[in-house]
């Protein structure tokens, strides 16, 4: 049986920011019992906490399914198509929403029009200072 786990509040305790020993043992026991524990998260794989990667998970579904790994091998590493990114920009502008995609190289694809929003400008600055790439969402 395949069993999916989220990270925040399920694997990592939101109050203490730790992984309880009981959680580590439970995931190990699942594998011993023949089950396949998988992490399912909206964040990209590069952002998965190293403590989670050290656990007995056999796979990861990351970035809302844009990256899928099983037994250490990526089966899917997709980038949203230009058409999808352009549609995302169109919809986010129409409904006054912020939209962005985190990329596998640690960068961010965002609608340049929203980069002036305080939340986005802080995130863009944080990524830039970490040497991460910033891409225009609706182009290339």
Residue ranges and their predicted role:
Residues 31, 38, 133, 139-140:
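A short, hydrophobic secondary-structure junction motif
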Residues 116-139:
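Acidic, His- and aromatic-enriched active-site or binding-groove loops in soluble protein domains
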Residues 24-121:
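Active-site phosphate-binding/coordination module
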Residues 19-21:
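A short acidic/small-residue loop/turn micro-motif
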Residues 1-16, 39:
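Asp-based phosphoryl-transfer active-site loop
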Residues 1-2, 57, 132:
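Generic intrinsically disordered, low-complexity segments enriched for polar/acidic and small residues
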């Amino acid at each position: 049986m395949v069993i999916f786990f989220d990270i925040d509040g399920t694997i990592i305790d939101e109050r203490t920011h730790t992984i309880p020993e009981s959680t580590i043992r439970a995931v190990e026991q699942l594998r011993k019992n023949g089950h396949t524990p998988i992490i399912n998260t909206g964040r990209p794989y590069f952002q998965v906490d190293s403590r989670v990667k050290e656990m007995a998970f056999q796979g990861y579904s990351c970035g809302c399914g844009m990256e899928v790994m099983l037994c250490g091998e990526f089966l899917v590493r997709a980038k949203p198509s230009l058409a999808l990114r352009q549609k995302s920009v169109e919809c986010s502008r129409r409904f006054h929403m912020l939209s962005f995609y985190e990329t596998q190289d640690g960068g961010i694809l965002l609608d340049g029009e929203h980069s002036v929003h305080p939340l986005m400008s802080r995130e863009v600055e944080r990524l830039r200072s970490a040497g991460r790439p910033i891409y225009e969402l609706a182009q290339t």
